[in-house]
């Protein structure tokens, strides 16, 4: 993949469906390689709550605060936006984690989405890399989130998961034509197939696509054909 020139700072958009494993991808496999801060509204909100020790569950009030307090969720999201604004103003390198599900058609026929952020970053001189973790279907997203909740993790309403899934796919499909480079991973399969790279592109040229390298599993093509259709 083409790397950013010294004159261009790096900005990484880490995105994926709820339960896709994007946080794990970053913290277990990528953080020590890139060595840059990851801006994440959920983690910022968690930093305001009591620390969890071992398998001990949070008290009920803390779980409600994390999962249901829309006021503080909004404060956390706006705080991350403020941090990002400052980072961009100072030309600091950073990564930003998001479900990337914002896709809102406007009355003037434009669409409000995170692609606006990508265009802003590129206009500010950043080399923008999109990392996306895909899942075969929304049922897998729902199942992963339920497992996470059972283990004491963050809850997301089923309705939101169902609404977000196709919007994320649509937004990523459009973003691929805007970013400088992108790597798409599949995380639909078993443990030994975790984070399979399935599509790599840079400067609007496809460098690798698993569909051209063989016969990928149907779980992969189920979403990859939607997000990055081959012409």
Region locations from a protein language model:
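Phosphate-binding P-loop
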Residues: 2-8, 87-88
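Short hydrophobic/aromatic beta-strand immediately N-terminal to the Walker A/P-loop
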Residues: 11-13
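P-loop (Walker A) phosphate-binding loop of NTP-binding proteins
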Residues: 17
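Conserved glycine(s) of the Walker
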Residues: 21
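Hydrophobic positions on the alpha1 helix immediately C-terminal to the Walker A/P-loop
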Residues: 25
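Conserved nucleotide-sensing/catalytic segment adjacent to the nucleotide-binding pocket
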Residues: 36-110
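ATP-dependent NMP and nucleoside kinases share a basic, alpha-helical "lid"
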Residues: 99-151
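Conserved GTP-binding G-domain of TRAFAC-class P-loop NTPases and closely related GTPase folds
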Residues: 140-231
């Amino acid at each position: 993949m083409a790397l950013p020139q010294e004159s261009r700072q790096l900005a990484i958009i880490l995105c994926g469906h709820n339960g896709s494993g994007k946080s794990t991808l970053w913290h277990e496999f990528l953080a020590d390689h890139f060595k840059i801060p990851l801006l994440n509204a959920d983690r910022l909100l968690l930093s305001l709550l009591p620390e969890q020790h071992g398998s001990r569950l949070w008290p009920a009030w803390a779980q409600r605060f994390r999962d249901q307090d829309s006021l503080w969720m909004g404060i956390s999201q706006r705080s991350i936006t403020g941090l990002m604004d400052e980072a961009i103003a100072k030309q600091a390198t950073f990564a930003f984690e998001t479900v990337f599900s914002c896709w809102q058609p406007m009355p003037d026929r434009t669409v409000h989405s995170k692609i606006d952020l990508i265009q802003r970053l590129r206009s500010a001189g950043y080399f923008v890399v999109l990392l996306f973790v895909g899942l075969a279907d929304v049922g897998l997203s729902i199942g992963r989130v339920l497992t996470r909740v059972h283990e004491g993790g963050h809850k997301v309403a089923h309705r939101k998961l169902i609404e977000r899934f196709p919007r994320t796919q649509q937004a990523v499909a459009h973003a691929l034509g805007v970013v400088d480079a992108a790597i798409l991973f599949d995380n639909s399969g078993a443990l030994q197939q975790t984070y399979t790279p399935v599509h790599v592109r840079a400067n609007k040229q496809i460098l690798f696509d698993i569909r051209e390298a063989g016969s990928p599993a149907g779980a992969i093509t189920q979403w990859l054909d939607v997000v990055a259709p081959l012409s």
